[in-house]
Amino acid sequence: MRVEINADDYGLTKGVTDGIIKAHRGGCVTSTTLMMNGLSVEYAVEQAKSNPALKVGIHLVLTWGRPISNDVASLVQSNGKFRYTSSYREMDPPSLADVEKEWRAQIEEFKKTGLTLNHIDSHHHIHAWSPLTDVIIKLAKEFEVPVRYADTLKDYPEICWTEKIWVQFYQDGVNDNLFEQLKEEKVRSLEIMTHPGFVDEDLKENSSYLFTREKEVDVLCSIQIPEWVE
């Protein structure tokens, strides 16, 4: 089975970025996804270029911070920050034109870094929200980049990065028997979503997921990869 161990939130803060790099260099993280509106993007890009074995994708955002583009009124509050939260499914959908404009701007900003765009996913899985399905399919095909699996994309296997995503490595699910849980999965490819990081002041101000990130670093650096993993 091909297993991709992806670290989300790259570039969110310096501490998160450092934790991801440690979980890659000293552990089993194989890829990460960069938030183009994060607080530590420039540093994250430098670290990625110093660690070329780390595959880097983009973590598309509509639910944290500020947009890259101007004039995307349906996406923002009066203070200029995104109006959507992790509870976006309870909210009215935005203008699809605004979503496409903003996500395209984020992808173009990524391409300016000189990094190779490996794959696409999103903060809080918002690309898996059914009103946005057509937008993510269009961008994946246009930029010729695979997307994190979601049930809304099950009829489009040609654009999915893997056949399945494992989201249970989170909160109380962070433990070192990860691969014992995975070995019975009957798929050829699977992505494990992770969130390693070190807690810094910026993270405390911008995320509710804190010290478990440091536990993730420790676990990801201690897990032994079984032979059946490609």
From Swiss-Prot:
Lineage: Bacteria, Bacillati, Bacillota, Bacilli, Bacillales
Positions that bind Mg(2+): 59, 123
InterPro entries according to UniProt: COD_ChbG_bac (IPR022948), Glyco_hydro/deAcase_b/a-brl (IPR011330), YdjC-like (IPR006879)
Cofactor field: Mg(2+)
Any one GO MF annotation of this record: deacetylase activity
Known EC number: 3.5.1.-
Family: Belongs to the YdjC deacetylase family.
Protein name: Carbohydrate deacetylase
One Pfam family named in its UniProt record: YdjC
Superkingdom of origin: Bacteria
UniProtKB keywords: Carbohydrate metabolism, Hydrolase, Magnesium, Metal-binding
GO BP terms: polysaccharide catabolic process
Organism: Oceanobacillus iheyensis (strain DSM 14371 / CIP 107618 / JCM 11309 / KCTC 3954 / HTE831)
